[in-house]
């Protein structure tokens, strides 16, 4: 495992070199309706993510692209299970990861969805 400080400008390059990205967000009530921006950015680079469930749409997005890497509980059994998958079985499908990112986080899709909502309200 290599942990390295990086400037904002170098983040895409460094993330793109990664085999995995990992982040955990405590699933507080305020996080139920949020979505981690970094998740879309990382997935758009085709990098598999290890993260926890219970935050915004994370569960749904992970189940579509890399369900094996979703940590459902903060305990050693879950961590060990994901580590075992990482080290032995997991072959990331970077194309699926990128497609899922595009489906959920694309600016064009977001603009279109908001436009549809506003049109429904106004009509």
Which stretches of residues belong to each language-model region?
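A charged, aromatic-enriched C-terminal amphipathic alpha-helix characteristic of glycosyltransferases
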Residues: 73-78, 88-120
């Amino acid at each position: 495992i290599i942990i390295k400080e990086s400037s904002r400008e170098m983040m895409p390059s460094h993330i793109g070199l990664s085999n995995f990205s990992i982040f955990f967000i405590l699933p507080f009530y305020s996080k139920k309706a949020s979505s981690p921006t970094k998740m879309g950015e990382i997935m758009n680079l085709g990098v598999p993510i290890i993260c926890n469930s219970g935050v915004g749409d994370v569960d749904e997005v992970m189940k579509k692209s890399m369900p094996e890497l979703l940590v459902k509980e903060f305990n050693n059994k879950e961590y060990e299970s994901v580590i075992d998958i990482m080290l032995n079985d997991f072959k990331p499908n970077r194309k699926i990861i990128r497609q899922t990112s595009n489906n959920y986080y694309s600016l064009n899709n977001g603009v279109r969805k908001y436009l549809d909502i506003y049109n429904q309200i106004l009509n």
